[in-house]
Design a protein with these regions (language model features):
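A glycine- and Lys/Arg-enriched "phosphate-lid" helix/loop adjacent to the NTP-binding pocket
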Residues: 107-158
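ATP-dependent small-molecule kinase phosphotransfer cores
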Residues: 36-100
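ATP-binding Walker
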Residues: 13
Length: 176
């Protein structure tokens, strides 16, 4: 059985920080999809100049559509190329309103038993409130309320009132 632990959740919840602490505790490498995604996207045609042009000329929705079209490939590749490690997914890479894209992400994550959704609170309103103090609020409510991460997760851990080390230990306990 593989030992990958995959952390998902909205921006600012602490996936990368908890992932680093967990990787240190378990003596596993840490892989952050945010660090690798654009390299993966370029393999299938993503172009920074084109993304910039779309952003400048066609506004946010067109830019989001362009970038989001590459995200399932990034998720697939980070899982195919990295084993026996802690992987933290980007805040938006596991959420999509596009059924075909979400199905690809769901299929890629389905074989993994240790997919852990991190959220500040069981209460979505409280999660949004907490996350807004950490990051730009524009997209957070959508990410917290979307059913996508809940559908992908095998475990859900609420971070409210816990230290980073306590969250790390809870992830470790639930995934071993």
């Amino acid at each position: 059985m593989s030992s990958e632990i995959i952390l998902i959740g909205p921006f600012g919840v602490g996936k990368t920080t908890v992932g680093r602490l967990l990787a240190e505790k378990l003596a596993l490498p840490q892989v952050s999809l945010d660090d690798l995604c654009y390299g993966y996207y370029q393999e299938i045609g993503w172009n920074a100049q084109e993304a910039g042009r779309i952003y400048e000329q066609e506004a946010g929705d067109a830019f989001d559509e362009y970038t989001c079209s590459f995200e399932p490939y990034g998720v697939e590749q980070v899982l195919l190329r990295n084993h026996d490690c802690v992987i933290d997914m980007g805040g938006g890479q596991t959420v999509s309103e596009n059924e075909t894209r979400f199905a690809r992400v769901q299929d890629a994550l389905a074989p993994y038993q240790n997919v852990v959704l991190l959220l500040p609170s069981l209460d979505p309103e409280e999660s949004v409130r907490v996350l807004k103090t950490r990051r730009s609020p524009d997209f957070l409510e959508y990410l917290v309320r979307s059913p996508c991460n809940y559908a992908l997760a095998k475990h859900v851990i609420y971070t409210e009132g816990k230290s980073l080390e306590q969250v790390r230990d809870e992830v470790s306990d639930r995934t071993q």
